[in-house]
């Protein structure tokens, strides 16, 4: 069974008025909306993800003294007794739950409502970063994505949305590691970076995890 996963098509990422606008993200609205309705694709299920942060989320630069957005930051494991760390990035405040910025863009939300499409939220625990729609960066806390896919007998996932080098990539890798046949549809994604080398590296990482990377 095939499931389409639409990643983070939210105002803060897609609208020019958003706080963390992905370049050319608006270009995806109509194509992804059409893709969700494409009968030839034979989607068994569609899942839409959202960043859904509390205002004090650890990934927001404003919540750290003397830190600016896009600066590097060392995340420490939230698990007591675990001294592991991960290097990451601090972001502008974005997708604070129940605000305009966290809302799905209208065309996607309309389909969610009319077709009763599943929404999976991530990033709602204050003390940890998330990119994958399956779990936090530590793989400690799990969202309900995998349980939903298993419940509906999914064995194949197709992933679209933003941003390619962050949440799309992480979600695809998680899906592949969980045993799903995974495909990223590049024409239906957009990266934050405009560096071709960054995009090439993402493609290589995806392919190294046996993920299909195709245009459409």
Curated annotation (Swiss-Prot):
Gene Ontology BP term (one) = rDNA heterochromatin formation
Molecular function in Gene Ontology:
metal ion binding; nicotinamidase activity
Reactions that this protein is recorded to catalyse: nicotinamide + H2O = nicotinate + NH4(+)
What parts of the sequence cross the membrane?
none
Q: Name the Enzyme Commission number(s) assigned to this protein.
A: 3.5.1.19
Report the pH sensitivity of activity. Optimum pH is 6.5-7.5.
**Main localization, broad class:** cytoplasm
Places the protein is found: Cytoplasm; Nucleus; Peroxisome
Q: Where is the active site?
A: 8, 122, 167 (nucleophile)
Question: What keywords is this UniProt entry annotated with?
Answer: Cytoplasm, Hydrolase, Metal-binding, Nucleus, Peroxisome, Pyridine nucleotide biosynthesis, Zinc
| Annotated GO CC locations | chromosome, telomeric region; cytoplasm; nucleus; peroxisome
Thermal response of activity = Heating at 60 degrees Celsius inactivates the enzyme. Heating at 60 degrees Celsius in the presence of substrate prevents inactivation.
**Which pathway is this protein assigned to?**
Cofactor biosynthesis; nicotinate biosynthesis; nicotinate from nicotinamide: step 1/1
Q: What else is known?
A: Has a cis-peptide bond at 162-Val-Ala-163. Present with 7720 molecules/cell in log phase SD medium.
Return the similarity comment.
Answer: Belongs to the isochorismatase family.
| Protein function | Catalyzes the deamidation of nicotinamide, an early step in the NAD(+) salvage pathway. Positively regulates SIR2-mediated silencing and longevity by preventing the accumulation of intracellular nicotinamide, an inhibitor of SIR2, during times of stress. Also acts on nicotinyl hydroxamate.
Protein name stated in the entry = Nicotinamidase
Q: Which organism is it from?
A: Saccharomyces cerevisiae (strain ATCC 204508 / S288c)
Give the gene that encodes this protein: PNC1
């Amino acid at each position: 069974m095939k499931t389409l996963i639409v990643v983070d098509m939210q105002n803060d990422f897609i609208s020019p008025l958003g706080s963390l606008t992905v370049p050319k993200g608006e270009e995806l609205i109509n194509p992804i909306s059409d893709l969700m309705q494409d009968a030839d694709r034979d989607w068994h299920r569609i899942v839409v993800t959202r960043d859904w942060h509390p205002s004090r989320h650890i990934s927001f630069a404003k919540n750290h003294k003397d830190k600016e957005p896009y600066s590097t930051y060392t995340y420490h494991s939230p698990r007591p007794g675990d001294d592991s760390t991960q290097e990451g990035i601090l972001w502008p405040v974005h997708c604070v739950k129940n605000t305009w910025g966290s809302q799905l863009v209208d065309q996607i939300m309309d389909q969610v409502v009319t077709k009763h499409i599943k929404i999976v939220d991530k990033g709602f625990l204050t003390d940890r970063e998330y990119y994958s729609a399956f779990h936090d960066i530590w793989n400690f806390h799990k969202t309900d994505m995998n349980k939903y896919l298993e419940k509906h007998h999914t064995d194949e996932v197709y992933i679209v949305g933003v941003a390619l080098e962050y949440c799309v990539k992480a979600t695809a890798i998680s899906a592949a590691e969980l045993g799903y046949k995974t495909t990223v549809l590049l024409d239906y994604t957009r990266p934050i970076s405009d560096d071709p080398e960054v995009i090439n590296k993402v493609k290589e990482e995806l392919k190294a995890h046996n993920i299909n990377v195709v245009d459409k």
